[in-house]
């Protein structure tokens, strides 16, 4: 019998719709388990235990939610479970998947995030399909680590938690940074994707040490920016932030001319208030940079490489908040497969 811990946090997968408004009411997060038991009787022998550290629509996610979720997970002996499923809202799924991928990398069982495009009671919802995929992965993969299960583009995709990219706003489909999902579930089995960009199953079975104490306090803020044409940095105040992650264009470029439109002007503001400024995501395999970036990097702007902006942002949140952590060194390490095509740093 498989013993699976289900961690309910709300989101669309834990909501109901009333008069055209989706929300979390009473026991609505528990509807998922009742419907799964009804629709998937072949998994009746699974023993589900449930905890509910908080219930929110995930657009309301804050650092405090991450502190609560990690506190709940770090207090669990993961070796006593076949797996853990965390239900979450789809809006910020990529962020929580990534940060818990880092924090729970030493788990002794598979931890699988999942979500839904519509409430469980909607006939068009993929909630049961996604939850079932998470169960099938736990039972059949033989792996440990942190993952995300979500059906996208007609595939029951399994993602490495630190490589999940936010969903397309129109289709509600998720993708993987680097373009390769980790695998899929099909007919009740896990089918790995043997891409050279993915870690091997032996790598996933390595014993990894935890990077954090049992409790975390995320008191230092990190800002996330995205470059766009005519971005006016004079309107942005980095005061009070430990760091700023500036996601450049796809070549990791950002404007370096035009006064307040230049990232160089913002770098001066960041330096004046003690906020570290990061630009990326660079490709570490490339030895050449554009002239615009060469000028920016000579100003002392830091660079992050080979990872999504969700992974970079959440990594920075930990880099600037975990005790006894050198932020620069932490950002360059490959903590939990977030850096595509690179081996783990330890």
Per-range role (PLM):
Residues 2-346:
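Active-site histidine-anchored catalytic micro-motif
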């Amino acid at each position: 019998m498989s013993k699976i811990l289900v961690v309910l946090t709300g989101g669309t997968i834990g909501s109901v719709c009333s008069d055209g408004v989706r929300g979390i009411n009473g026991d609505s997060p528990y509807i998922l388990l009742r419907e799964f038991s009804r629709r998937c009787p072949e998994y009746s022998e699974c023993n589900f235990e449930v905890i509910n550290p908080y219930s929110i629509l995930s657009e309301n996610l804050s650092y405090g939610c991450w502190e609560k979720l990690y506190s709940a997970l770090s207090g669990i002996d993961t070796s006593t479970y076949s797996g853990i499923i965390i239900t979450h809202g789809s809006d910020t799924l990529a962020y929580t998947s990534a940060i818990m991928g880092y924090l729970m990398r030493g788990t002794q069982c598979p931890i699988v995030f999942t979500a839904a495009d519509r409430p469980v009671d909607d006939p068009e919802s993929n909630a049961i399909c996604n939850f079932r995929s998470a169960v099938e992965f736990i039972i059949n993969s033989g792996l440990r680590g942190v993952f995300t299960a979500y059906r996208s583009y007609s595939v029951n995709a399994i993602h490495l938690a630190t490589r999940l990219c936010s969903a397309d706003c129109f289709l509600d489909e998720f993708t993987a940074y680097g373009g390769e999902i980790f695998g899929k579930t099909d007919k009740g089995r896990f089918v790995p994707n043997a891409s050279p960009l993915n870690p091997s199953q032996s790598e996933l079975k390595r014993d990894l040490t935890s990077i954090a104490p049992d409790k975390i306090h995320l008191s230092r803020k990190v800002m996330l920016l995205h470059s766009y044409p005519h971005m006016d940095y004079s309107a942005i105040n980095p005061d009070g932030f430990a760091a700023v992650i500036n996601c450049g264009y796809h070549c990791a470029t950002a404007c370096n001319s035009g006064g307040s439109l230049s990232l160089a002007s913002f770098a001066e503001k960041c330096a004046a208030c003690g906020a570290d400024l990061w630009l990326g995501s660079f490709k570490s395999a490339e030895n050449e940079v554009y002239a615009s970036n060469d000028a920016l990097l000579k100003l002392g702007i830091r660079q992050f490489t080979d990872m999504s902006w969700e992974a970079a942002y959440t990594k920075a949140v930990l880099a600037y908040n975990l005790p006894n952590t050198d932020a620069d060194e932490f950002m360059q390490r490959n903590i939990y497969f977030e850096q595509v095509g690179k081996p783990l740093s330890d």
